[in-house]
Amino acid sequence: MAEKLKVDLVTPYKKILSEEVDEITATGALGEFSVLPGHAPFLTSLKIGELTYKKSGQIVHLALNWGYFEVEDDKVTVLVETAERADEIDLERAKAALGRAEAALKKLSPEDKDYRVMEAALERALIRMQVAGKAARK
């Protein structure tokens, strides 16, 4: 069994991360899960949420959009629409996005075709703010 996990995190635009880590935690469609070296192979979808990894005692936080997470032979591949490290998130921009999403949702009914889009925007803004707050507390 390997002592580390090799993690590659990729968006359609660039590779965000390629590192060996001790542990990784993400938000799957069925809830939060963690992976340690020696984990059984699996593939799952990710929802908008937080990804954290631990490396040499340090914990790094990222905000993720929808995607996929695969584990095989101590190699983790994360494919997502977007990913931002906590210290890269513009908190004011996230707050503005939250305000826009809340305002749009007040004007829409759940049957409206844009309602779910705005719900996702709201969720994304909340996660970005939550993750950015973790960088601010360091």
From Swiss-Prot:
Pfam families: ATP-synt_DE (PF00401), ATP-synt_DE_N (PF02823). GO terms for biological process: proton motive force-driven ATP synthesis. InterPro entries: ATP_synth_F1_dsu/esu, ATP_synth_F1_dsu/esu_N, ATP_synth_F1_esu_C, ATPsynth_dsu/esu_N. It is a peripheral membrane protein. One of its GO terms (molecular function) is proton-transporting ATP synthase activity, rotational mechanism. It is found in: Cell inner membrane. GO terms for cellular component: plasma membrane; proton-transporting ATP synthase complex. Keywords: ATP synthesis, Cell inner membrane, Cell membrane, CF(1), Hydrogen ion transport, Ion transport, Membrane, Transport. The keyword Lipid biosynthesis does not apply. The keyword Ion transport applies. Belongs to the ATPase epsilon chain family. F-type ATPases have 2 components, CF(1) - the catalytic core - and CF(0) - the membrane proton channel. CF(1) has five subunits: alpha(3), beta(3), gamma(1), delta(1), epsilon(1). CF(0) has three main subunits: a, b and c. PANTHER family: ATP SYNTHASE DELTA/EPSILON CHAIN, ATP SYNTHASE EPSILON CHAIN, CHLOROPLASTIC. Produces ATP from ADP in the presence of a proton gradient across the membrane. NCBIfam families: ATP_synt_epsi, PRK13446.1. This is ATP synthase epsilon chain. The lineage of its organism: Bacteria, Pseudomonadati, Thermodesulfobacteriota, Desulfuromonadia, Geobacterales. The gene is atpC.
